[in-house]
């Protein structure tokens, strides 16, 4: 979000212990950027990568961050006089930056990467396959997928929590991203994909990257009808561009094999640095 921050509305707040420990009021002029009626919850994403679910309530005509806010404040160790900027992506997620009293940006409440051995990584993947009701077993397609994905993880790769979990909610905005999409009308680079056996990573086609001179950082933001999720970049020996956490998008959008298509729209800044992937789900009746 920060790479394209001028496109997003924002506000700043000074943290005062006596008034902001239990709840935080959103400035009244900023309410024009929020949905009416207000969503019941929003997501706060810190610079450390984690996501917090926080209740949003209207009290005496003003919007307040309530349940969940004290935990955010505690885990960020907010001190009296420090201030924060809140950048809103329009999809119920705020990116929050914390500055100390001298104006230096602080990175706090960082998510920790967990290094796993190759055997541990395999067992995690198998456990996740057992727990999902989206992907159907298909040995033939597994073999085809392995041929397409012949790269292997580096031996010293750290497998981290690639997507920061989000609480399940009713997808009130899902219709915006589903239905008949005019692909030709998209002005940003884009590509189609379908539900595959290897759902844990989203591979960006090499020709799309090359033809559009795109650059990618260490993480990407997925945007769908429920909000945003952050996926970390995978490490491959052949330098292919892929991002983890795609399985969460597949599951929460209930994608079906041989039936649904996803058009992935790559949002980038003026320097061709891709910061977000907007997910358009195209349903096809069985």
From Swiss-Prot:
Gene Ontology molecular function, alphabetical: sequence-specific DNA binding
Classification via SMART domains: B3
Pfam families per record: B3
Chain segments carrying region Disordered: 117-161
Subcellular location: Nucleus
CC per GO annotation: nucleus
GO BP annotations, alphabetical order: regulation of photoperiodism, flowering
Composition bias type Acidic residues, residue spans: 119-159
Protein origin, superkingdom: Eukaryota
Matches recorded under InterPro entries: B3_DNA-bd, DNA-bd_pseudobarrel_sf, Plant_B3_domain
The entry's DNA-binding region: 9-102
Alphabetically ordered keywords of this record: DNA-binding, Nucleus, Transcription, Transcription regulation
PANTHER family: B3 DOMAIN-CONTAINING, B3 DOMAIN-CONTAINING PROTEIN REM20
Protein name as it appears in the record: B3 domain-containing protein REM20
Organism: Arabidopsis thaliana
């Amino acid at each position: 979000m920060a790479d394209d921050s001028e496109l997003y509305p924002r506000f700043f707040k000074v943290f005062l212990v006596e008034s902001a420990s239990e709840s935080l009021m959103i400035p009244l002029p900023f309410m024009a950027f929020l949905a009416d009626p207000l969503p019941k919850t929003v997501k706060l994403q810190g610079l450390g990568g984690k996501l917090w679910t926080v209740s949003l309530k209207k009290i005496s005509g003003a919007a307040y961050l309530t349940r969940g806010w004290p935990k955010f404040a505690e885990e960020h160790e907010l001190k009296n006089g420090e201030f924060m900027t809140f950048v809103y992506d329009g999809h119920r997620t705020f990116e929050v930056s914390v500055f100390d009293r001298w104006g230096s940006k602080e990175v706090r409440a960082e998510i920790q990467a967990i290094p796993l051995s190759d055997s541990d990584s395999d067992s995690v993947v198998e456990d996740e396959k057992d727990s999902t009701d989206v992907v159907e077993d298909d040995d033939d397609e597994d073999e085809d997928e392995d041929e397409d994905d012949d790269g292997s993880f580096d031996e010293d790769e750290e497998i981290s929590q690639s997507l920061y979990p989000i609480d399940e909610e009713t997808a009130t905005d899902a219709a915006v991203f589903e239905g008949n999409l005019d692909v030709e009308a998209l002005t940003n680079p884009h590509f189609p994909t379908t539900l595959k056996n290897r759902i844990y990573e989203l591979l960006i086609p090499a020709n799309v990257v090359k033809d559009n001179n795109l650059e990618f950082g260490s993480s990407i933001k997925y945007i769908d009808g429920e909000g945003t999720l952050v996926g970390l970049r995978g490490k491959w020996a052949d330098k292919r561009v892929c991002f983890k956490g795609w399985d969460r998008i597949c599951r929460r959008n209930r994608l079906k094999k041989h039936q649904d298509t996803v058009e992935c729209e790559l949002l980038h800044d003026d320097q061709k640095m891709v910061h977000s992937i907007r997910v358009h789900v195209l349903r096809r009746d069985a």
